[in-house]
Every structure is written in structure tokens, then in C-alpha cells.
Design a protein with these regions (language model features):
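Active-site gating/metal-coordination segments in enzymes
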Residues: 1-83, 90, 134-141
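Active-site gating loops and adjacent loop-to-helix segments of metal-dependent hydrolytic enzymes
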Residues: 36-50, 98-99, 129-132, 182-190
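Short, electropositive alpha-helical surface patch
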Residues: 1-12, 95-102, 152-161, 183-193
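Catalytic pocket-lining loop regions of alpha/beta-barrel enzymes
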Residues: 55-167, 176
């Protein structure tokens, strides 16, 4: 990715989010190697888990290694089920200097039967200043999604986090393979849903953030 950026006329991608297993004893060594790349900004680790006792956010080794994110001044992309949000809040509060980015709109899959639960989770976690929200991934869990369906989530997310702490993303090619949706269809829906935003607000959620 760094090679691609170096050769691109606009230096895209201008930021790289990598992976390090924070439960691994070599986590610090892996992070040090990543730091050699100019555009490296943070890591992403999938923490989705429906078994509370096995949740990595309760693992002492994982929590100890998480201090490395703070040490290297990196961001952390957090992918969880929204039912895990209270554990996530505990972790986020422990590391107030780390910028957290909640992935895929706090994964609302279970909200089909508990929309109020997802809404509560979004509103509570948005109360933490060091958290931003990435709005994406609907096609990965809702194969027959449509603009009206995802607008319910997007409007609540924007209201909770505000345009300064939200960003839109495509989740491609994963969404393409699962929902058979085109890249353009997601962006067309996003633009339609956010048509009420001012130019500055739209620039924030689609470019600057």
C-alpha cells in the first residue's frame, strides 16, 4: 500500500490502517515494523463476539497490549456487535487519548428485531469524545438493503455523532460479493440520504473526516 501511495500522483491512499493481533506476544514488534511505513496510522481488529466470557475486550493480555496503541499514538478501528457496546465503552474510557473509529455503523444486524437497542447503543457510545463512526457495511448483513432501509440507521447515526465525527465508506468488495450490490448504488443512496446537509457538512462526512 505504501508503494502504491508513493507512486500515485495524489499520494493515495494517504493513510493506512493495518492489522496487529493485540493478544499476540509479538504485538509490539509487529507495530514497530508497521511504523516504518510513512502512511501507517492505526490498526483494525475484528472483535465481534456473542460469547461474553471469551470477549477480547475482557482479555488481560489484549488490554495490556492495547497500551501500545497509545504509546505509538495510533488510532484503533473497532468492529463489534452493538450488543457489545458497554464493554467497548469501558475500553474506550480507559484510553481517552486514543482515537477510536467504530466500524460499520456499530453493526446493526441484530437490530432487525431490536432497533431500539441499537439506537440506545449508538447514542451512548457517541457520548465519548474520542470516538468517531464509520457508516458502511450494510450489504454485508442485509442482502436486500435499500435506500429507505439504511436511511433509518444513517439519520440516527448522524444525529448522534454529528458530521464532524462521521465518515462514509463502501466496504467493497465485501458488500459486492454478499449483497450483489454495485459500488455506485451505495454512494447514490448515501448522497440521497444526506442531501439535506450543507456543503461543509457533506465535505466532512465524504472527504475531510
Amino acid at each position: 500500500m505504501q508503494k502504491i501511495s508513493n507512486s500515485h500522483p495524489l499520494k493515495f491512499p494517504n493513510a493506512i490502517i493495518g492489522f496487529v493481533d493485540l493478544k499476540d506476544s509479538d504485538a509490539e514488534k509487529d507495530l514497530e515494523e508497521h511504523m516504518n511505513f510513512q502512511n501507517f496510522r492505526g490498526i483494525r481488529q475484528i472483535l465481534k463476539n456473542k460469547e461474553h466470557d471469551n470477549d477480547l475486550m475482557l482479555n488481560n493480555i489484549w488490554l495490556e497490549n492495547f497500551k501500545l496503541i497509545n504509546k505509538f499514538e495510533l488510532s484503533f478501528d473497532l468492529l463489534i456487535y452493538y450488543s457489545q457496546y458497554k464493554l467497548a465503552i469501558d475500553v474506550i474510557k480507559k484510553f481517552p487519548n486514543v482515537q477510536f473509529v467504530i466500524n460499520h455503523c456499530l453493526w446493526p444486524e441484530e437490530s432487525i428485531g431490536d432497533f431500539e437497542g441499537w439506537t440506545t447503543a449508538i447514542r451512548e457510545i457517541s457520548g465519548l469524545d474520542n470516538v468517531a463512526l464509520k457508516i458502511s457495511g450494510f450489504g454485508e448483513w442485509k442482502i436486500d438493503w435499500n435506500t429507505n432501509f439504511i436511511s433509518n440507521y444513517i439519520n440516527i447515526a448522524l444525529d448522534a455523532f454529528g458530521t464532524k465525527r462521521c465518515m462514509f465508506a463502501s466496504n467493497f468488495p465485501v458488500d459486492k460479493f454478499i449483497s450483489h450490490s454495485s459500488y455506485e448504488s451505495f454512494w447514490s443512496s448515501y448522497f440521497k440520504i444526506t442531501s439535506h446537509l450543507s456543503n461543509d457538512e457533506a465535505n466532512d462526512v465524504f472527504m475531510k473526516n
